[in-house]
Amino acid sequence: MNGTEGPNFYVPFSNKTGVVRSPFEYPQYYLAEPWQFSMLAAYMFLLIVLGFPINFLTLYVTVQHKKLRTPLNYILLNLAVADLFMVFGGFTTTLYTSLHGYFVFGPTGCNLEGFFATLGGEIALWSLVVLAIERYVVVCKPMSNFRFGENHAIMGVGLTWVMALACAAPPLVGWSRYIPEGMQCSCGIDYYTLKPEVNNESFVIYMFVVHFTIPMIVIFFCYGQLVFTVKEAAAQQQESATTQKAEKEVTRMVIIMVIAFLICWVPYASVAFYIFTHQGFNFGPIFMTLPAFFAKAAAIYNPVIYIMMNKQFRTCMITTLCCGKNPLGDDEVSASASKTETSQVAPA
């Protein structure tokens, strides 16, 4: 066995020399050098310093400016809330534990940290699914003159939470479990063992199929259809140049969000799947820690992408930060750019 399993942990280090200790009780400096734990703490501090202000600002600016409260923005705000869950429920905890070299909050704290980190990641994934469906319904028009309105956005937000809880809650009630991972300073789903006592194998399969593969299939299908429809509409000049530009800007923004999500989460999911399907494989703590670095960066990129690619939101943010004045003098964007969900790009 290339790892050491305890009642509520799995340390990726053989205990032949007898040095392995519970990650809830002793520093894990036999897994990595102390300076590496310090680097992990510094990275968590950076994510907190960047992640909290930018996501909080996203929420605050939307509350301050009524024009931003569009159905599409409800989903984007949901992403900001998910990111804040990751900041407060995950990053702050990992910062503190990495400074101590082990998970000082015990199994209960591990459950809470793992729950919030998983919840935030799943809300983000399912929010991207809802955004993909919204873009598909609005642009491709599979249901004639359907309009994506406030009630649909609220139902979409509700769906993201239901599906996220369906993934994050089971380990708390006996289906799988949360355990320290990587350098043992943060917690996640147990990908390392089969653990029949908690039916871990069935849960991991369920999670990869329902909460990763299916969402990815939906997203790629929607955007495949969307790209084809937009190209056909542009070729036939079925819409005004202004409407086409507005649709393309929103669609481009959402597609970039999906690409960023894949860059952040696919390495983590791939490594987790590899570990799970290669039980007994000899891997070190850094093998899982590095992909987790990419995954945790997800709390920053969504609001950055939105601010950079949405002129109306960017203008409102600058106005809010500058006490009601915009020193850049940007003109207000047209209604078509802020309410693209009602446009009429016809299907090919």
UniProtKB/Swiss-Prot annotation:
The lineage of its organism: Eukaryota, Metazoa, Chordata, Craniata, Vertebrata. The modification N-acetylmethionine is found at residue 1. This is Rhodopsin. Homodimer. Interacts (phosphorylated form) with SAG. Interacts with GNAT1. Interacts with GNAT3. SAG and G-proteins compete for a common binding site. Interacts with GRK1. Interacts with PRCD; the interaction promotes PRCD stability. Forms a complex with ASAP1 and ARF4. Forms a complex with ASAP1, RAB11A, Rabin8/RAB3IP, ARF4 and RAB11FIP3; the complex regulates Golgi-to-cilia rhodopsin/RHO transport in photoreceptors. Belongs to the G-protein coupled receptor 1 family. Opsin subfamily. The modification Phosphoserine is found at residues 334, 338, 343. It comes from the Eukaryota. Its main location: membrane. Keywords: Acetylation, Cell projection, Chromophore, Disulfide bond, G-protein coupled receptor, Glycoprotein, Lipoprotein, Membrane, Metal-binding, Palmitate, Phosphoprotein, Photoreceptor protein, Receptor, Retinal protein, Sensory transduction, Transducer, Transmembrane, Transmembrane helix, Vision, Zinc. The chain crosses the membrane at residues 37-61, 74-96, 111-133, 153-173, 203-224, 253-274, 287-308. Residues 330-348 are annotated as: Interaction with SAG. A motif ('Ionic lock' involved in activated form stabilization) lies at residues 134-136. GO terms for biological process: absorption of visible light; G protein-coupled opsin signaling pathway; visual perception. Zn(2+) binds at residues 201, 279. The record marks 113 as: Plays an important role in the conformation switch to the active conformation. It comes from Pagophilus groenlandicus (Harp seal). The modification N6-(retinylidene)lysine is found at residue 296. It is a multi-pass membrane protein. GO terms for molecular function: 11-cis retinal binding; G protein-coupled photoreceptor activity; metal ion binding. Residues 62-73, 134-152, 225-252, 309-348 are cytoplasmic.
